[in-house]
Amino acid sequence: NLQEGDEVMVTGPAGKRFLLPEEPERHDYLLLATGTGIAPFRGMIKELLEAPTPSKSDIHLVMGVPYTTDLLYDDFFRELASSFPNFHYHTVVSREIQPDGEPGGYIHHYLDRQIHLHEDLLSRDRTLVYMCGLAGMQLGVFKMMAERGLGDAYLKVKPDYAEVAPAEWDSHSIRKYVRPTHRCMLEVY
C-alpha cells in the first residue's frame, strides 16, 4: 500500500540492443512485428516521425497477426502512412485472405512474395532490421533472407553450419548456429 511520496526502487531499461541507434537519421528501418511485438515499434516510430524535425529515413513496418481484428494501433499507423511519405505500413493476416487476393501467411511469406518492395531496402548498407514478437518469425525471416541472398548483412552463420541449406534450418539450429549481426535486432519469445 504505497502512499504518495513513498520511495520505490525501479530498474531499467534492461535491453541494450533493441533501441534506436544514437544517430537514427543515418539509417533506414525494416520493423517486423507479430502481435504484442508491435509495442516497442510504436514508440520508435513516434520518436522518429513526431520529433520537431521528423526523420527522412525510409521506414517500413510489417505487422503480422492471425485476424484483422488483432491489428493493434492500426488506425494510428495508417494515419502516419498517409501523413509521412517515408513511412510504409504493411499488414499480414495469417488466417484471412489478403487484400491482394493472396492466401493468408506469415511475415516471411509476405516478404518473399513482395520482395520487389523490400529488396532494395534490405540491400542498403544503412538499413537496420528489428524483429519483435513470436520466435517463429525469426526462423522464417532468417531462412527467407538467406535463400534470397540477403542474409550476409544481417546474419552470421557459424562455419560448421555454412553448408546446410537454409530450407533445412529449424528453430533449434538457428539458436545454435545462426546469429544476428549488428544490423539485426531481435526481441522474440
Please describe what each predicted stretch is:
Residues 1-30, 44-47, 94-95, 173-174, ...:
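FAD-binding FR-type
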Residues 11, 49-56:
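Secondary-structure boundary elements
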Residues 30-33, 131:
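Catalytic cysteine-centered active loop of the rhodanese-like fold, especially the PTP/DSP P-loop
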Residues 60-189:
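Reductase modules of NAD(P)H-dependent flavoproteins
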Residues 40-52:
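Histidine-anchored nucleotide/phosphate-binding helix
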Residues 34-40:
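Ser/Thr-glycine-rich phosphate-binding loops at phosphate-binding pockets of nucleotides
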Residues 22-25, 53, 122-123:
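Short, flexible hinge/linker loops that cap or flank conserved catalytic cores
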Residues 20, 41-43, 140-143:
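Short glycine-/acidic-enriched loop or helix-start segments at secondary-structure transitions
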